Amino acid sequence: REALLAEGKNPYGHAAFEYSHHIVDLDEKYAELADGENTEDAVSIAGRVMAKRVQGKIIFFELQDATGRIQLFCRINALGEDVFAEMKDLDLGDWIGAHGLMMRTRRGQLSVAVDSLLSKALRPLPEKFHGLNDKETRYRQRYVDLIVNDEVRDTFQKRSKILSAFRRYMEADGYYEVETPILQTVQGG
């Protein structure tokens, strides 16, 4: 935080970022894009950095939003040295906004070029390789576990959908939900 403040940057990012698409929408819209093909379609997306690979004058990020993941393709000649240096300082877990043209790399990966940063995370996420293995940490910092582990996030989403469907079904039959500890003056178990 102090390093960002010393550079004259807001450590809490921008107030708003207008995105044009969710990642799943881009996957569907550009599914037929051939390997190595570029488009003139400008898009704006936002999400969390889940992986980063620096290869000389190119940086690849894996960006995740609530709907999916996509690769970001950053070239020093397209961004300039200052912005490229900022991109190198990004950590796992940072929220960024990406604006650029849709393309598919020669290896067939759907990608977007990056030119803006929403916010730098003050505490980076665990590395993807080592992950979050300590059970106690996973339970104490459930928010980190939900960000890092797709399986845990899917379990919570499924649970939420099941409970919601059950509530709707019961409400349609005239039932209402009562949380029983509320009815007692002393909580117990």
Feature map (PLM): residue ranges:
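Class II aminoacyl-tRNA synthetase catalytic cores and aaRS-like
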Residues: 1-189
